[in-house]
């Protein structure tokens, strides 16, 4: 009888099932197409948890209802993850929040990720300093509840032009850990990491509070 075993992608952390005699010895290709992309600018994505249940409700309350009580909680969660897995992040010299657009026409006139990272920086001190190396210069169309082709179109037009690195010298040669709240499709993280790599960063990885589960179904229009 075939034995089913589970594999974990070293790039995105998603699990995949391998079916074969004894479970097989060769890991299957990750379902996320970005993980096998030769020009992927993002080394890996680390996540504290998955975007479901009570954790998802807390993130939605913070991000969409501006329940600011969650900011220090999320900051402590991220810092605790960094401390528990310190050896994973020892090469990274700086934490960079994925920025929000807060100018005219912004969906949210406040930086939700920046606020969480401020708490991380307060707790981490000089070990993992927080620097805003990337700026978002324009609002972008939301990608939640969009099909993959629509997300790809948004990413290749508005998203790619929205993020800039004002001072490339600040990124040059550095190992940078970008931080965001949720990784769903990964397009935002990939776009920000590509901007940093184009500015001269040696390596970019990402840490998020929660990652979406590939294949998970959510009601249309849900965040």
Segments (PLM) and residue ranges:
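Glycine-rich phosphate/pyrophosphate-handling loop used in enzymes and phosphotransfer proteins
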Residues: 1-223
């Amino acid at each position: 009888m075939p034995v089913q075993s589970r594999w974990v992608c070293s790039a995105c952390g998603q699990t995949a099932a391998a079916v074969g005699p004894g479970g097989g010895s060769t890991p299957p290709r990750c379902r996320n197409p970005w993980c096998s992309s030769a020009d992927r600018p993002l080394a890996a994505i680390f996540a504290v948890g998955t975007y479901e249940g009570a954790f998802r409700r807390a993130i939605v309350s913070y991000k969409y209802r501006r329940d600011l009580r969650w900011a220090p909680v999320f900051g402590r969660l991220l810092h605790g993850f960094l401390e528990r897995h310190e050896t994973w992040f020892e090469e990274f010299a700086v934490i960079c929040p994925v920025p929000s657009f807060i100018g005219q026409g912004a969906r949210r006139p406040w930086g939700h990720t920046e606020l969480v990272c401020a708490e991380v920086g307060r707790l981490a001190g000089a070990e993992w300093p927080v620097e805003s190396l990337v700026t978002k210069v324009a609002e972008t169309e939301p990608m939640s509840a969009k099909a993959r082709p629509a997300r790809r179109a948004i990413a290749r037009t508005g998203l790619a032009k929205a993020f800039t690195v004002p001072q490339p010298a600040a990124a040059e040669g550095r190992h940078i850990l970008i931080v965001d709240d949720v990784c769903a499709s990964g397009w935002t993280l990939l776009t920000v990491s590509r901007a940093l790599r184009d500015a001269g960063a040696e390596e970019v990885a990402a840490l998020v509070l929660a990652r979406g589960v590939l294949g998970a179904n959510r009601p249309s229009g849900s965040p």
